[in-house]
Swiss-Prot record:
Top-level lineage group: Eukaryota
PROSITE patterns in UniProt: HECT, RCC1_2, RCC1_3
The encoding gene: HERC4
UniProt-listed Enzyme Commission number(s): 2.3.2.26
Annotated Gene Ontology cellular component terms: cytoplasm; cytosol; fibrillar center
Reaction equation(s) it catalyzes: S-ubiquitinyl-[E2 ubiquitin-conjugating enzyme]-L-cysteine + [acceptor protein]-L-lysine = [E2 ubiquitin-conjugating enzyme]-L-cysteine + N(6)-ubiquitinyl-[acceptor protein]-L-lysine
Domain HECT stretches: 730-1057
Function: Probable E3 ubiquitin-protein ligase involved in either protein trafficking or in the distribution of cellular structures. Required for spermatozoon maturation and fertility, and for the removal of the cytoplasmic droplet of the spermatozoon. E3 ubiquitin-protein ligases accept ubiquitin from an E2 ubiquitin-conjugating enzyme in the form of a thioester and then directly transfer it to targeted substrates.
Protein name: Probable E3 ubiquitin-protein ligase HERC4
Enzyme class: transferase
Length: 1057
């Protein structure tokens, strides 16, 4: 051991020497053949811990700070600690803390301000005593200020006690002192790496390099750009991105070490202790310029001086106050910039020089400073081992974190045979949000040091792998302990306000734990976890949303699937029956799960869909609840102003309606909602008509009205007749049930006539003879023609017809691209829509965007124009102002493609689409429609082609003499299944009025086949109103085939049989 500095009280441990000041490093004979584990320096005393855990002290003992009876100039063992294996010490001005290998803390010395934490009345304690209030807490670090003390626990909890004159306890109170350790609640949840204390200021350092400081700040020693004392922890923002790994404090100054080996200092600089070649104070962290270029691995602060070790040269540098020789430069001069401590320093792994006396060279192991003294633990070049590196924290001094080594240790014990300490270790880790927040860090490239509002610093793949490694069926005791800790200790303590972004990480990682997706834990872990998440204040929730937004899709989907499973689990319980006494808590649980999904859905939509929108669909909803009733309840809640944006406590009193969270509905459920909404509106229209008709009986002035919207049309003039009626129709009448009458036909419209009406009128309206739509050969799709001569009324009519079809639950045959449905739902068409409508043009646009070279102008020769046909002639249209003079290049090509798409789908047809849109929404507007995705709305309007012919057979019903095994029925299905696809589609058209199936699927298409009294010479007859087929009792398969094909080839017109 080398020692230098103030020796006036024997604090260097050199024995009875004549000098009161040692100006340069001097070997201490006492430590020959002794290995030093730690050194603590007070103002006038020093404490040494040897590798065997014994403690020695020397220096002034006026206040009992040595832990034995008298002052000593040579180190003397503290006998009271003989039975303890001490691993670390720290000294205040005149008090000492010692930490043993069990995490227990012993204190002695001056207790004027409660700095010993013993809650006693004695001014001085001369024999070490255990701090009993910390005896049940495993402490890993201690730090002493002059008159206050700090401790860090394995569970990442910080405790403070002693003087609080300047707020150095960080408790936010103006009490002058605390005589017992106080938990620093304001920092709960943060994963800490270190605690440090100066004269009257304090710091904590997180695992990802964030520094929080509080206490005295007269000289800017907190680095907060001012000189105001702080009574609560404050984040030192300027160093957040610097990868700080270690921090130490002097009386009124602070030094911080970076991962790259740089040093920042701030605070009092009157003696040059900041190393900036000046005596100015610094209120902001400033890098020590003269150490740049060297990699520093150790730093230490004395009262008013600073030391730094550079392993590449083996040298120690010091700066600051030198009046007591504490700089080791051979003089008492102050140094304002780093100066080499005198000595024959030898770097680790250096090349031995020939003919040297190895005893005269020193390989530094570790440096210590405090008060006005300094120490260096060294070895000879011959026995030189690697020096300590403060950039690599000692694992024994760190908080619990879930990692590979810890899991392997836990799994190494046979199931059911855990030692108590292992159970305590598991419990401590999973009871602490701070420990979980320090787990699974993204250590590759030191990524976790970038933790902020946009980046979590978490390796999610590591979290998943380690959780799955830990939670295994053959180690149930571990799973049970983890679950109990989460349920009873961690989640109940969560708060809505968090001190820092690092305290949020476990909200990201915990869903990866298999216990969360175990239905046995839904109500005890997953839902309480979701409650804490939903209750987060706006700022932390926003950060969590930011982190979610950059997750890989499978990881994001994992969280969504978890809470979907929770919802399904709860709805199954609801279907079985919830006792009245438990309904309130059930409401709260269900609202929680749905609220979490709502937040995730908001993030998904904001990011342009991390996962497909349909991944939020809960397909079981229709089976588990009555959607129609749910919708009615929701409408009533809206009418009575029940706000579902309350907190979860208030929501518990409001019955849950799934319609409040419509993103969970799949297309079939949405269709049911729309149909329910239409039925409600129809009923309201009918009721209003009945009321008016009743009134007309007593008040002749009031004209009676029809409860239905009646369309009387001729087949030969279907468009003209329909337009005539619809032009005169009031908006309110569109909400009535539609009945269609074909002139000269006897059928009563129970649905089938209406189906054919839509089929025929749309065929007419979309006929090229009107010139209203352009037909695209490549895609076989149509789009509005900007060259039409037709009045916009006709487009308005088509919109009304489409709206009426949806409103009246009828499929219509429209060959529009998906872009139409996007526009109806207020979504923008994209290049993909252009590819669908105009495949060749779309491919060309994609090639333009993908072209890798810079010579786009020469290769493509494009400008911001589009060439269109106009009755045989071509016409050039500018896509932007001065488009003809604007060449398309690499920088603006995306803008050109966007403008092209916008022209085709928007600008060129704006007035025509507006008329269509107005007509459509006149009938079918409303909140429910906007729940649909474009492709879902398309499927609802035109049906889909997801044919399942076996399902059709399975769902068919029989009347009269027929049943499933009747001979005629058996040959009917044989014939049907042998028909080609086109004939099967024709059969659907013949029987139902459409060759497409409803969005609800084949199972919703109920066919009925009944026997007739006629002979085999008769054809099958369809009643499209009822999806009913009259099938004669054919006995021969070929006869049935011939008659069926003949019937479906002639399927237009209605007559009574």
């Amino acid at each position: 051991m080398l020692c230098w500095g103030n020796a006036s009280f024997g604090q260097l441990g050199l024995g009875g020497i004549d000098e009161e000041i040692v100006l340069e490093p001097r070997k201490s004979d006492f430590f020959i053949n002794k290995r030093v584990r730690d050194v603590g320096c007070g103002l006038r005393h020093t404490v040494f811990v040897l590798d065997d855990g014994t403690v020695y002290t020397c220096g002034c003992n006026d206040l009992g700070q040595l832990g034995h009876e008298k002052s000593r100039k040579k180190p003397e063992q503290v006998v009271a600690l003989d039975a303890q294996n001490i691993v670390a010490v720290s000294c205040g001005e005149a008090h000492t803390l010692a930490l043993n290998d069990k995490g227990q803390v012993y204190a002695w010395g001056l207790d004027s301000d409660g700095q010993l934490g013993l809650v006693g009345s004695e001014e001085c304690i001369r024999v070490p005593r255990n701090i009993k209030s910390l005896s049940d807490i495993q402490i890993v670090q201690v730090a002493c200020g002059y008159y206050h003390s700090l401790a860090l626990s394995k569970a990442s909890e910080v405790f403070c006690w002693g003087q609080n004159k300047y707020g150095q306890l960080g408790l936010g109170t103006d009490c002058k002192k605390q005589t017992s350790p106080q938990l620093l609640k304001s920092l709960l949840g943060i994963p800490f790496m270190q605690v440090a204390a100066g004269g009257a200021h304090s710091f904590v350092l997180t695992l990802s390099g964030a520094i929080f400081g509080w206490g005295r700040n007269k000289f800017g020693q907190l680095g907060l750009n001012d000189e105001n004392d702080r009574y609560v922890p404050n984040l030192l923002k300027s160093l957040r991105s610097q990868k700080i790994v270690y921090i130490c404090c002097g009386e009124d100054h602070t030094a911080a070490l970076t991962k790259e080996g740089g040093v920042f200092t701030f605070g009092a600089g009157g003696y040059g202790q900041l190393g900036h070649n000046s005596t100015s104070h610094e209120i902001n962290p400033r890098k020590v310029f003269e150490l740049m270029g060297s990699i520093v691995t150790e730093i230490a602060c004395g009262r008013q001086h600073t030391s730094a070790f550079v392993p590449s040269s083996g040298r120690i540098y010091s700066f600051g106050l030198g009046g007591n020789g504490q700089l080791g430069t051979g003089s008492t001069s102050n140094r304002k910039s780093p100066f080499t401590v005198k000595g024959n320093w030898y770097p680790y792994n250096g090349q031995c020089l020939p003919d040297i006396d190895s005893e005269e060279y020193f390989c530094v192991k570790r440096i210590f400073s405090g008060g006005d003294q300094s120490f260096s633990h060294y070895s000879s070049p011959q026995n030189c081992g690697p020096p300590d590196d403060f950039r690599c924290p000692n694992p024994t001094k760190q908080i619990w974190t879930v990692n590979e080594a810890l899991i392997q240790k836990w799994l190494s014990y046979p199931s059911g045979r855990f030692p108590v300490e292992i159970a305590n270790e598991i419990d401590g880790t999973f009871s602490s949000s701070g420990c979980l927040n320090g787990s699974f860090l993204a250590v590759s490239n030191d990524d976790h040091y970038r933790t902020g509002t946009r980046f979590s610093g978490v390796d999610m793949n590591a979290a998943r792998l380690l959780f799955h490694k830990l939670i295994q069926p053959d180690h149930p005791q571990i799973s049970q302990q983890v679950a109990a800790s989460l349920e009873k200790n961690l989640i109940p303590k969560l708060t809505s306000s968090l001190p820092d972004v690092e305290a949020l990480r476990f909200y990201l990682t915990l869903p990866e734990c298999p216990l969360m997706s175990d239905s046995n834990n839904f109500t005890t872990i997953a839902i309480p976890f979701g409650t804490a998440l939903v209750n987060l204040e706006k700022a932390p929730l926003k950060v969590l949303e930011n982190w979610w937004s950059v997750l890989e899709p499978p990881l994001f989907l994992k969280i969504v699937e978890l809470f979907k499973e929770v919802v399904v689990h709860l709805l199954k319980l609801y279907k079985i029956g919830i006792p009245p006494s438990e309904r309130r808590i059930f409401n709260s649980f269900l609202h929680t799960a749905l609220k979490v999904l709502e937040i995730l859905h908001r993030v998904n939509e904001k990011m342009g869909q991390i996962i497909q929108y349909d991944k939020f669909y809960i397909h079981e909803v229709q089976e588990l609840i009555d959607i129609r009733n749910d919708y009615i309840n929701w409408v009533q809640q809206q009418a009575y102003g029940m706000d579902v944006n309350h907190g979860l406590t208030e929501l518990a009193d409001i019955p849950v309606t799934i319609c409040t969270y419509p993103f969970v509905f799949d297309a079939q459920a949405k269709t049911t909602l729309l149909q329910t909404d239409a039925v409600l509106q129809m009923q309201m229209a009918i009721d209003q008509a009945h009321r008016q008709n009743v009134s007309s009986l007593f008040l002749p002035v009031i004209e009676s009205v029809n409860p239905c919207l009646i369309l009387v049309v001729r087949r030969e003039n279907i468009v003209g007749d329909a337009m005539e009626v619809l032009r005169k129709t009031k908006n309110i009448d569109y909400k009535k049930p539609l009945k269609v009458i074909f002139v000269g036909e006897d059928a009563v419209d129970a649905g089938g006539v209406r189906k054919e009406f839509f089929l025929l009128i749309m065929r007419e309206l979309l006929d090229p003879k009107y010139g209203m739509f352009r037909y695209y050969e490549d895609s076989r799709l149509i789009w509005f023609s900007d060259k039409t001569f037709e009045d916009s009324d006709l487009f308005h009519l088509i919109g009304v017809i489409c709206g009426l079809a949806i409103y009246n639950c009828t499929i219509v045959d429209l060959h529009f691209p998906l872009a139409l449905y996007k526009k109806l739902l207020k979504k923008k068409p994209s290049l993909d829509d252009l590819k669908e409508l105009m495949p060749d043009v779309g491919r060309s646009m994609q090639q333009l965007l993908d072209y890798p070279e810079d010579d786009i102008e020469e290769t493509f020769c494009l400008n911001f124009t589009i060439t269109v046909e106009n009755f045989g002639a071509t016409e050039v249209k500018e896509l932007v102002l001065n488009g003809a003079d604007t060449a398309v290049n690499k920088q603006n090509r995306q803008e050109f493609v966007d403008a092209y798409v916008d022209y085709i789908f928007n600008k060129s047809v704006a007035s025509l689409f507006d008329a269509f849109h107005a007509g459509f929404h006149k009938v079918c507007g409303g909140k429910v429609l906007l729940l649909f995705q474009p492709n879902e709305l398309q499927a609802m309007v035109i049906g889909n082609t997801n044919y399942d012919w076996k399902e059709l057979e399975k769902n068919t019903e029989y009347k009269g003499e027929y049943w499933a095994e009747h001979p005629t029925i058996k040959i009917f299905w044989e014939v049907f299944h042998e028909l080609p696809l086109e004939k099967k589609k024709q059969f659907l058209l013949f029987l139902t009025g459409s060759d497409r199936i409803p969005i609800l699927g084949m199972k919703s298409l109920k066919l009925v086949i009944q026997s007739t009294g006629g002979g085999e010479e008769y054809l099958p007859v369809s009643h499209t109103c009822f999806n009913l087929l009259d099938l004669p009792k054919y006995t021969e398969k070929e006869t049935l085939r011939s008659k069926l094909i003949q019937a479906i080839d002639h399927n237009e017109g209605f007559s009574l049989i």
